[in-house]
Amino acid sequence: MSFLSGFFGPICEIEVVLNDADTRKVSEIKTEEGKVEKHFLFYDGESVAGKVNIVFRQPGKRLEHQGIRIEFVGQIELFNDKSNTHEFVNLVKELALPGELTQSRNYDFEFMQVEKPYESYIGANVRLRYFLKVTIVRRLTDLVKEYDLIVHQLATYPDVNNSIKMEVGIEDCLHIEFEYNKSKYHLKDVIVGKIYFLLVRIKIQHMELQLIKKEITGIGPSTTTETETVAKYEIMDGAPVKGESIPIRLFLAGYDPTPTMRDVNKKFSVRYFLNLVLVDEEDRRYFKQQEIILWRKAPEKIRKRTNFHQRFEPQEPQASAEEPEI
């Protein structure tokens, strides 16, 4: 697989071909428009190497330039402030000194053991992307083309992964106990738990478990929170009775969530909550949120050959009181 730039007028095309393009895995990412793009997948510490091909399609053409370079860029862009993009990685390789091209040329490049500290992410209000940027410098207008890559951050099994157990209720009306088997789940995991009814004096019509994603961008008064319901799991439809216990099994693999991201470069965070929702016969809704951590488990081949490590944030998941609660 190669990246193809398209035409720069009638003069030339630019191609970027990775050295391991035949064997490197491709991953998908959903854009802000909802389209799915496929790009080569990299991990933190991996080198990025290949060739830049400047291809003349018509003989006899000439291209004067002030130099040719390639950059490896990691960038955060806030959609509500597109003029203020932040580059947290920028590595440059000069491919050619100023001169003139009269025929097709190719240039080798290699960025050794590149630090890629964050996961690629496209959300409601922010995008974190990695890309190769080829620039042919000219007197008037540079020829520039960008080629996106995808980066996944891998994590080891957490040293501590306590279950979540909590009793909640409305005084003299409803008292329930809920339990989830873990507080940290990998992206293909299964959330297992149970709901136990200790006291039921209101008529519950419906109960469901939601996986809520909260994307927080900005700092201080300019903070924006975007909330999305990633998954819904119907626990019961009908009235429970005292002493009843209802099991929970929510398969994360079917919903393709991202890992939890905390304070990424002081620009944004992505947090996940389990939201227990009860609806009574008068259509009143009761909520209880509990934060969980989602992490990306390394594939078996990567675990065997790579000494990777992602530290989990020291903060334990917390219950949320941002909505009306039980």
Swiss-Prot record:
Superkingdom: Eukaryota
InterPro entries: Arrestin-like_C (IPR014752), Vps26-related (IPR028934)
Biological processes annotated in GO: intracellular protein transport
UniProt keyword Membrane, yes or no: yes
Coiled-coil spans in chain: none
Annotated membrane topology: Peripheral membrane protein
Record GO cellular component, one term: early endosome
Locations listed in the record: Cytoplasm; Endosome membrane; Early endosome
Keywords on record: Cytoplasm, Endosome, Membrane, Protein transport, Transport
Keyword Membrane tagged: yes
Alphabetized Pfam families for the sequence: Vps26 (PF03643)
Assembly mode: Component of the heterotrimeric retromer cargo-selective complex (CSC) which is believed to associate with variable sorting nexins to form functionally distinct retromer complex variants.
Protein family (similarity comment): Belongs to the VPS26 family.
Function: Acts as a component of the retromer cargo-selective complex (CSC). The CSC is believed to be the core functional component of retromer or respective retromer complex variants acting to prevent missorting of selected transmembrane cargo proteins into the lysosomal degradation pathway. Retromer mediates retrograde transport of cargo proteins from endosomes to the trans-Golgi network (TGN).
Protein name according to UniProt: Vacuolar protein sorting-associated protein 26A
Organism: Xenopus tropicalis (Western clawed frog)
Recorded name of the encoding gene: vps26a
